[in-house]
Amino acid sequence: MTVKTTVSTKDIDEAFLRLKDIVKETPLQLDHYLSQKYDCKVYLKREDLQWVRSFKLRGAYNAISVLSDEAKSKGITCASAGNHAQGVAYTAKKLNLNAVIFMPVTTPLQKVNQVKFFGNSNVEVVLTGDTFDHCLAEALTYTSEHQMNFIDPFNNVHTISGQGTLAKEMLEQAKSDNVNFDYLFAAIGGGGLISGISTYFKTYSPTTKIIGVEPSGASSMYESVVVNNQVVTLPNIDKFVDGASVARVGDITFEIAKENVDDYVQVDEGAVCSTILDMYSKQAIVAEPAGALSVSALENYKDHIKGKTVVCVISGGNNDINRMKEIEERSLLYEEMKHYFILNFPQRPGALREFVNDVLGPQDDITKFEYLKKSSQNTGTVIIGIQLKDHDDLIQLKQRVNHFDPSNIYINENKMLYSLLI
């Protein structure tokens, strides 16, 4: 049997009919804060408000619903960092199917619990592997051994068609408001979302520039399409943006993206964190890291989008509240507002007071202080974190630190030390 490897607008239209009573029609909102910030009209497609708080339900339900009754009776499997798993779990419960869901051991607990909640007794969750790609290998082996049906999170035409219904829905909403998009920004993980959206836009909104956004530590589509002109596997990835951290994109999504995507933007994970905090404080939007990617990319494109009409897909809102401290930390480091040093402190009374008086600026704050006292020596090693009010104060801070201890180590510039100590 020939496996279908292309997606058409007809496929997306058919998927739209399957999903119309299953998924929520999520809002397309004009965002006044971002519009003012970038001197353009910025619309947000709020898939973070979907039933499972991400767009993944669209692709999962469509891919499962087209299975034959015989195939459904054998059960389904999937591998996912979280959101696709929730879509599969929701569908399994809705259609009363048995599902075994494989998730990386690094998946935030909030996402694991949500999968169990949506799937209830229809779902078994297996945590395995440090990355999605390791998890995928385990899932495929299990699927083959148990003759079940693997629901691919992105490299499947039915999954892609389901994700493409987001574009059809969005364009219908825009048409009713007489809105035409000049730019569309959407996250890329494995490529299912950008493939589905771009397929529909290239036919029904061909003048819209499609911009794919990846975390800089996992830019597998950019490396495949732009750098190598073939699908490549990244040897190492930063897993922080867990919903978009994939070492290898799909063969199908690669071909579609290569044809349809106009440009790629890589966003630093720290910038994503700043966007998450900004969206929460300014717009009351709770976006997960992958969900904030599209908005993060606007800063890279600010000169191009001025005076234009832009839409950003907020792809998910499954953010674990326990990660907020790390998100704030990464944001402060990216904004050059928090700095860490290793210093030698004199082991005598008053040394800390001297440091505060001589080194700290009037608006600086100590956020971390660990003092290892060595009784046989005159000095002890101190790990100290300092938060600035203005990142422009860094040069003077470094000068004062160097005067206090010329042998100090600036941890921010040493990734290995930072990962070990902070």
Curated annotation (Swiss-Prot):
Classification via Pfam families: PALP, Thr_dehydrat_C
One annotated GO biological process: L-serine catabolic process
SUPFAM superfamilies, per database record: ACT-like, Tryptophan synthase beta subunit-like PLP-dependent enzymes
Cofactors named for this entry: pyridoxal 5'-phosphate
Domain ACT-like: 339-413
EC number: 4.3.1.19
Annotated pyridoxal 5'-phosphate binding sites: N83, G189, G190, G191, G192, L193, S315
N6-(pyridoxal phosphate)lysine modifications at: K56
Disulfide bonds: none
NCBIfam families linked: PRK08639.1, THD1
Family: Belongs to the serine/threonine dehydratase family.
PANTHER family: THREONINE DEHYDRATASE, MITOCHONDRIAL, THREONINE DEHYDRATASE, MITOCHONDRIAL-RELATED
Function: Catalyzes the anaerobic formation of alpha-ketobutyrate and ammonia from threonine in a two-step reaction. The first step involved a dehydration of threonine and a production of enamine intermediates (aminocrotonate), which tautomerizes to its imine form (iminobutyrate). Both intermediates are unstable and short-lived. The second step is the nonenzymatic hydrolysis of the enamine/imine intermediates to form 2-ketobutyrate and free ammonia. In the low water environment of the cell, the second step is accelerated by RidA.
Protein name as catalogued: L-threonine dehydratase biosynthetic IlvA
